[in-house]
Structure formats: structure tokens, C-alpha cells
């Protein structure tokens, strides 16, 4: 069963599935992101010489900096290895950027141990089947509006925005609100 809630200044609603939350009142301390399909729109541009290009949303980048400034650890775990992903992660100050990991449970668990976090203290966002272990393990999970059916089923929240089009920012704002770092605002009719 889905319920609707409103978060943020936009007053936009999100579809939240009822599922008992493993958070047990803990604050979220770390954010785990898939890259392709979450931080990008999932498309990869390849020039004639083989150079790869990706497009990252600047609003998502600002949200990432905001999360880091609020004291959250930020990790990107990607199935692909890309210099563009490395450069963007470095530019934003992402704490961990792990690439070439098609199986994401092991790096997720490794970072939880390194950062001394319970899974209930983490939030994860992903858009496809390789992301399911993170979505299922995290205390809070979400997926972009254009995620695959499997990711939509596994996530606690299906966001309004698509991957590479503000989904990461929407997710970050939601986590900050859950942590009490942002006030929840409802738009007046």
C-alpha cells in the first residue's frame, strides 16, 4: 500500500510504500548512491575516439555538498569504471567512490564497517537490479521515478524526479528532513 507525503519547499508529494522501517529511531549518517541511472540519466556518450562522457545535474551536486556539510558520509558505488565519475566525485568531496562493482553488497558492508555504522544508519538510492542489496539493507531507501520495476519494489520510496534530473537532490533533501536538518514544509492550497 502506498501513502503520500510532502517534503521540501516544492510541496511535491512522493509515493511512500508502507514497510516497517529498520531505522528504529536512528539518524541517517551515511548516503549510498548508485551512479548511472541515479546521478546520471543512465545514458553514456562515447565519442569516436572512445572518450566517454556523462552528464551530472548541478542541483544534485549542490545537494551532495549540502549533505556533506550536514555531516553525512557520502559513498558512490558504481558497476562501471569511469574517469568522469571519479572527477565528479572528487570535485564534490565524496568520501568514497567505488567503481567496477557489479555486486554492491560487499562494498556497502565494507564501508559500513569502516565508518562504524549500522545499516539502519544508512540511506541508499539505486535504479536497477545490481542496487537491490543496498536498497534492501539500508535503513532508508529510495529510487528515481524512472527506476526498473525491481528497484521500485525494493525501495521504500519512489521519488518524483528521474535519475540525472534531480532524483539525488530530492533523496538528499528527504534524508535531511528525516534527520531533522531540514524542516518539512507543506504548500498551502
Regions found by a protein language model. Name each.
Residues 46, 50-57, 90-92, 96-98, ...:
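Mg2+-dependent phosphoryl-transfer enzymes with acidic/Ser/Thr/Gly-rich catalytic loops
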